[in-house]
Amino acid sequence: DINGGGATLPQKLYQTSGVLTAGFAPYIGVGSGNGKAAFLTNDYTKLTATELSTYATNLQPTWGKLIQVPSVATSVAIPFRITDWSGISGAGRTGPITVVYRITYMSPDFAASTLAGLDDATKGVSPAPSNVSDAIAQVLPPNDPSAPLDVTNPDDGVAGVQPYPDSGYPILGFTNLIFSAFFTKAFFTKHFGDTNNNDDAITANRFVPLPDNWKTELSTYATNLQPTWGK
């Protein structure tokens, strides 16, 4: 089996039946930091220059180059800084808000459904999936012909800081995949495919599928990393 794990954010998605292709062991949610460490050392127990160098020396000849690409998108949830009921439209009351219980962290995929009817303060746009898609559509996909990726740099497959979008919900991010090139063919073919892909499962788990042009470029990028695919 191919053992995979990492961040708990996409854990429910990758544990959904049919999302991972044959040959994968069940995804283990251990937190993103431990996930990187486990992947790069083949140990269930981090990507700096030293980590990448160690992988390239010890494991790349056998497992192939690293691929790091976005998998799905999600809105980013930020706590509201409202201290008085008068700051909430339609509350029908005034006076200080008393916090009885505070959630220290809530995964944005689950927060998004709660916040979908609310608007951000600067643009009046809610974090609904369609608004996240509108914002992503304004960003060039990784490996766009106008800006091809450096296949020797795994960090190049992930979009960095982008200009403020003209439309859509602007506070968003991606959960990324890190793969060895020898072990990606079947999963990439399905996950980024035109049909029979994971889009329904992605949506059901409150994430946002990548645009079609992103899927095409990411598939091309991954294919070019290894002339001969592995499993």
UniProtKB/Swiss-Prot annotation:
<keyword id="KW-0808">Transferase</keyword>
<keyword id="KW-0548">Nucleotidyltransferase</keyword>
<keyword id="KW-0520">NAD</keyword>
<dbReference type="GO" id="GO:0003950">
    <property type="term" value="F:NAD+ poly-ADP-ribosyltransferase activity"/>
</dbReference>
<keyword id="KW-0238">DNA-binding</keyword>
<dbReference type="GO" id="GO:0003677">
    <property type="term" value="F:DNA binding"/>
</dbReference>
<comment type="function">
    <text>Catalyzes auto- and hetero-ADP ribosylation and produces short oligomers by elongating the ADP-ribose chain (up to 6-mer). Binds DNA non-specifically but with high affinity. Forms very stable complexes with circular DNA wherein the circular DNA confers thermostability compared to linear DNA.</text>
</comment>
<protein>
    <recommendedName>
        <fullName>NAD(+) ADP-ribosyltransferase</fullName>
        <ecNumber>2.4.2.30</ecNumber>
    </recommendedName>
</protein>
<dbReference type="GO" id="GO:0016779">
    <property type="term" value="F:nucleotidyltransferase activity"/>
</dbReference>
<keyword id="KW-0328">Glycosyltransferase</keyword>
